[in-house]
Amino acid sequence: PVGMDTLAVEGCLARLEKEMDLVVLPVFYYGAASFAVAQPERNGSIHVDSAVLRAMAEQMFAGLLRVGFRNLHFFIHHQSENFAAGMPTDLAFKFAARRATFAFLEETRGDGWWGDPAMANYYEAHAEGSDPFSWIQGHPLMDAEILAAYPFDHAGQGETSLMMALYPDTVAMDRHSDEQWYAASAVDASAELGEQGVEMILAHMRRVLG
């Protein structure tokens, strides 16, 4: 379905929220989708340039830091098979997080904040994930461990199975076509496989959220 990349994140967080004490912000549906798969006309893709995303995300992160949040996490599924190297959407949010954190530290602690004796434990804090640059962390919905065990695709078996498990009413297999090579494996999708994927994702989320 349209919006699958966001629905997958939203659906998994909805389940996780029932067992963890979380503040879940409204989902953000727009990203640097590109039109690499198909033209947008009569299809539905909306592309937002990564520079615009970065500016928006930076303002949002800056506001959350001022409110007092120090344990912020965002999850991205779109094009996240390249999350380590980065793709336009996740790079925009990662860069925004760094810029917002730097600006906040400079505003609240002043010049020389990193060289201050109070930061003498910076490298130890960084190793354990408690330094200021760990206040905002980005994650792929599926980490490398999941990618090794669950099919990652575009509207294929893996993604269709996730939707069958999380939002079954959004799946219309009668509209499946063999014309799209990337969606050919969707005929093998099942809610059972999707539930396996969801459980792996939830385990991943529990690990990174602590």
Enumerate the predicted regions with their spans.
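Extended, histidine- and acidic-residue-enriched regions that form the cofactor-binding/catalytic faces
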Residues: 1-210
